[in-house]
Amino acid sequence: MVIQKEKKSCGQVVEEWKEFVWNPRTHQFMGRTGTSWAFILLFYLVFYGFLTAMFTLTMWVMLQTVSDHTPKYQDRLATPGLMIRPKTENLDVIVNVSDTESWDQHVQKLNKFLEPYNDSIQAQKNDVCRPGRYYEQPDNGVLNYPKRACQFNRTQLGDCSGIGDPTHYGYSTGQPCVFIKMNRVISFYAGANQSMNVTCVGKRDEDAENLGNFVMFPANGNIDLIYFPYYGKKFHVNYTQPLVAVKFLNVTPNVEVNVECRINAANIATDDERDKFAPRVAFKLRINKT
């Protein structure tokens, strides 16, 4: 014989729920007395307080071993990478000479990028250094004492400086300037007391043919030793990264040209199997003319 369980009415369910939340007979709140709730809250307070204290202590101990100015560990690759300016999506520099809007965005980006390189700003913040040697500065033991940096003046970029330039870095005439920027690597030395230089080529034979002639600023794409070593963002507050400007004079119009630029120095390996692209940057250049 099957005994059917009596179905509770809605009122009974509500009454049972109210009694669970607060039972006036046993003085229990949600099935526990005040003492029971106090012990539970005390347990979790002590438990999570202990975890917080342990986490804080371990973080404090770890931070005592880390310098706020120089990283304790550095990347396995000591070779600096390269980037280009203007910064574009997918590293594609596309210029429609007759369409001002196509290259005006590049000009605006370059104006902002080169503003810290103005000669007047450099004269206020940085030193005039003797070329051809590293600008090494001893550690005087005062961590908050900033290192000095050498001037890199905008006028060193010649026809690509954009100073009084009616051609807007050459973009309005189909002779655009592209700037090569080397990433900062703390305590990097080029080696052999010889300046580094940047070279650019077409990636394939047809690219080399379509690339045409170009000129570099500073001359021969040289990067002087005075901008090294780099001591870090907090030590080298006013450090200015050296640039190499490449002005492309007669790129074959309406053709996509693959360009590769690399940095050359005695202490930079260009055949490192761990990262074959570390000392170079590849980008596409297209000059559209109607």
UniProtKB/Swiss-Prot annotation:
Ranges that cross the membrane: 40-67
Disulfide bond entries: 129-150, 160-177, 200-261
Cytoplasmic side: 1-39
Keyword set, alphabetical order: Cell adhesion, Cell membrane, Disulfide bond, Glycoprotein, Ion transport, Membrane, Potassium, Potassium transport, Signal-anchor, Sodium, Sodium transport, Sodium/potassium transport, Transmembrane, Transmembrane helix, Transport
Localisation per UniProt entry: Cell membrane
Glycosylation sites: 96, 118, 153, 193, 197, 238
GO cellular component, one term: sodium:potassium-exchanging ATPase complex
Ranges in the topological domain labelled Extracellular: 68-290
Family, similarity comment: Belongs to the X(+)/potassium ATPases subunit beta family.
Subunit-structure text: The sodium/potassium-transporting ATPase is composed of a catalytic alpha subunit, an auxiliary non-catalytic beta subunit and an additional regulatory subunit. Interacts with BSG.
Biological role stated in the UniProt entry: This is the non-catalytic component of the active enzyme, which catalyzes the hydrolysis of ATP coupled with the exchange of Na(+) and K(+) ions across the plasma membrane. The exact function of the beta-2 subunit is not known.
Swiss-Prot/TrEMBL domain comment: The C-terminal lobe folds into an immunoglobulin-like domain and mediates cell adhesion properties.
Name assigned to this protein: Sodium/potassium-transporting ATPase subunit beta-2
Gene name of the encoded protein: ATP1B2
